[in-house]
């Protein structure tokens, strides 16, 4: 059973419980793609822009930040596979610079100072530990809080915009619970088509968000109890990384239960090792502790065996995904 939930994980479960299982329980990691890499690089460049003095927050400097951020990470393992040649990478970079140029048509970063950036928010809602990172939090001219999220993609048409605020509503709820102040506004900045969608916040909205996330959490717990993570066929299936192993599309898809069992045992062993380390070693445990007779050498040996087994299963599934 997972111990924490983020808004993105909650949305993933709501979209398709099976996809949620593959990503978060089986821990079959989706390789970073070009769109994700671009979004991450754009986000980091915008964050670093506000490290500069206000009068230095120019478009040229923002473009240079994008180049520097990408230069620092382009040879990482998660990125080296993205491009077949320099022309592809150049076109990708030009598109990223265009997104940042669009940002300057929406805001003037020399005219304000964000209150916080890349802020961790976390809190307990009943038995749910909810956490996430918000891009930016400002105070408007009236001194009210505004939560801002950058989106490197395209804004939806107006009638579809409301569901996109789900994460920000939860962040607003956590901020209210943490500091006792209700944010006044939520803002989504879409860079691809230079659009800002905003939404006023009220207490009823936040209570509705609380009810919705708890309902999702209850459904997640039921799925764990019953070991049942059904597929939900939807319009996003064609873009899902896990489609080749999804039973909805492949009746011969590999069973990932053994992988889940491996992950659960590895987590239990790591928790035992962490508990022993926290008190400074086995010798500091009281005589009646259930961990007193723990053989750390044997535990670490078993951990190595399980991780090797897990890596073998993941490789086999990865080969299946790449077919």
Regions found by a protein language model. Name each.
Residues 4-5, 175-302, 318:
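Metal-dependent nuclease catalytic regions and adjoining charged, substrate-binding loops involved
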């Amino acid at each position: 059973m997972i111990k924490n939930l983020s808004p993105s994980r909650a949305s993933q479960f709501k979209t398709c419980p099976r996809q949620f299982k593959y990503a978060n329980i089986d821990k079959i990691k989706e390789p970073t793609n070009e769109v994700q890499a671009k979004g991450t690089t754009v986000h980091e460049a915008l964050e670093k822009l506000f490290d500069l003095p206000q009068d230095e927050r120019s478009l040229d400097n923002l473009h240079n930040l994008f180049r520097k951020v990408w230069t620092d990470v382009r040879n990482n393992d998660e990125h080296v596979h993205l491009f077949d040649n320099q022309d592809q990478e150049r076109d990708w970079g030009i598109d990223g610079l265009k997104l940042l140029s669009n940002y300057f048509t929406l805001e003037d970063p020399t005219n304000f100072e964000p209150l916080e950036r890349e802020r961790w928010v976390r809190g307990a809602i009943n038995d749910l530990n909810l956490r996430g990172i918000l891009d930016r939090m400002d105070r408007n001219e009236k001194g009210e809080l505004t939560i801002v999220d950058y989106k490197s993609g395209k804004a939806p048409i107006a009638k579809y915009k409301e569901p996109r605020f789900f994460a920000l509503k939860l962040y607003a709820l956590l901020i209210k619970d943490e500091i006792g102040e209700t944010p006044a506004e939520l803002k989504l900045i879409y860079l691809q088509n230079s659009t800002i969608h905003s939404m006023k916040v009220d207490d009823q909205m936040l209570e509705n968000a609380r009810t919705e996330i708890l309902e999702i959490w209850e459904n997640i717990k039921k799925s764990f109890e019953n070991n049942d993570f059904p597929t939900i066929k939807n319009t996003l299936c064609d873009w899902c990384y896990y489609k080749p192993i999804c039973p909805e599309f492949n009746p011969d898809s590999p069973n990932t239960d053994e992988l889940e069992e491996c992950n659960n045992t590895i987590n239990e062993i790591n928790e035992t090792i962490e508990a022993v380390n926290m008190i400074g070693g086995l010798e500091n445990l009281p005589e009646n502790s259930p961990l007193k007779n723990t053989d750390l050498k044997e535990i670490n040996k078993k951990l190595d065996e399980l991780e090797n087994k897990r890596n073998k299963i993941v490789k086999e599934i990865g080969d299946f995904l790449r077919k």
